[in-house]
Amino acid sequence: MTPSISWGLLLLAGLCCMVPSFLAEDVQETDTSQKDQSPASHEIATNLGDFAISLYRELVHQSNTSNIFFSPVSIATAFAMLSLGSKGDTHTQILEGLQFNLTQTSEADIHKSFQHLLQTLNRPDSELQLSTGNGLFVNNDLKLVEKFLEEAKNHYQAEVFSVNFAESEEAKKVINDFVEKGTQGKIVEAVKELDQDTVFALANYILFKGKWKKPFDPENTEEAEFHVDKSTTVKVPMMMLSGMLDVHHCSILSSWVLLMDYAGNASAVFLLPEDGKMQHLEQTLNKELISKILLNRRRRLVQIHIPRLSISGDYNLKTLMSPLGITRIFNNGADLSGITEENAPLKLSKAVHKAVLTIDETGTEAAAATVFEAVPMSMPPILRFDHPFLFIIFEEHTQSPIFVGKVVDPTHK
């Protein structure tokens, strides 16, 4: 007979993304032939693209008037790792909710894809800091299934910590210290409280630090207006950059598209909709269009103005993932029997995702560097990001969307 007690599991998907616009030496154009074309990379990029858009649309549905910022990679990695210990409908819901077609892709290939992605993200890069971490926090009297532990370590590079959840303050400190250290102090107090029945916690973080290949000069940053909506205007520090940039207008999306590279293996796509076309952009954008944007670069002389900003996201993944079909794991019908050898059933009592993004200029020494670029001697057209826009940050090798955001009001952190 199944015991009446139900143990709780905490899932924490945390992210820190710092994008300082330091001045850097100019570098050569990205060679698209060097992108990782392995089947594992293609598989994970395709599914993460679908998952990112589904998740974004659900966030818009829940709140269309606030900034959005999250990491599809962080959330998907945490749930995929959890699927290692799930069975039955719980297992199927997780993987299908992550947009995997289980009739076409084997479970082994799914986890190999995540393993390859995490290895790629954690690859040393002298110009770009991009690292991930997964922590398993286990009550000191709870015995985990050895197969789950081995696969979590092998595929997801998970670290295992023994904690006493009966001492909730100490348990919180262990988890928060792991996330704070991994995000270099940018995410603190990721866990504010623990349910009294929690016996197992899973935490994932991603840290990103990048420098623009074509940098902004802080001397050119000026206060300017940003139109939040038709009746609301705020003052923001607006960065400016002139030169040969990847900018074009996409008639399908009714939006201007700006593609900016980081020094290292990452790039950002900014999507600025025409007046009144934000909803059209959000409904039309898909992974096929994003792929075309990344492949079809169109350099032109242009002057761009974009806000210096810091935004964050703090989401309850239970309300966010349920509309995507991931429901069983959160209720008493959850089957996570592949995680623990204990008889008492385990369910996901809480799942949170925290994200932080900063785009800014830093330091006077950086401003002293010089970038040389030949440009035509004419006044460039001007593109102002002075009303709500979207952005996606990609890892170049796999073309996986690691961060997705919407800036509605740059003054709201």
From Swiss-Prot:
GO molecular function: serine-type endopeptidase inhibitor activity
Compartmental location: Secreted
Alphabetical UniProt keywords: Acute phase, Glycoprotein, Protease inhibitor, Secreted, Serine protease inhibitor, Signal
Signal peptide positions on this chain: 1-24
Positions of the record's site feature: Reactive bond: 377-378
Stretches the record annotates as RCL: 368-387
Cellular compartments per GO CC: extracellular region; extracellular space
Family annotation (SMART domains): SERPIN
Entry annotated with the keyword Glycoprotein: yes
Family per record: Belongs to the serpin family.
Function: Inhibitor of serine proteases. Its primary target is elastase, but it also has a moderate affinity for plasmin and thrombin.
Note: Murine alpha-1-antitrypsin is represented by a cluster of up to 6 individual Serpina1-related genes. The precise complement of Serpina1-related genes present varies according to the strain of the animal.
Protein name, per record: Alpha-1-antitrypsin 1-2
Chain's gene name: Serpina1b
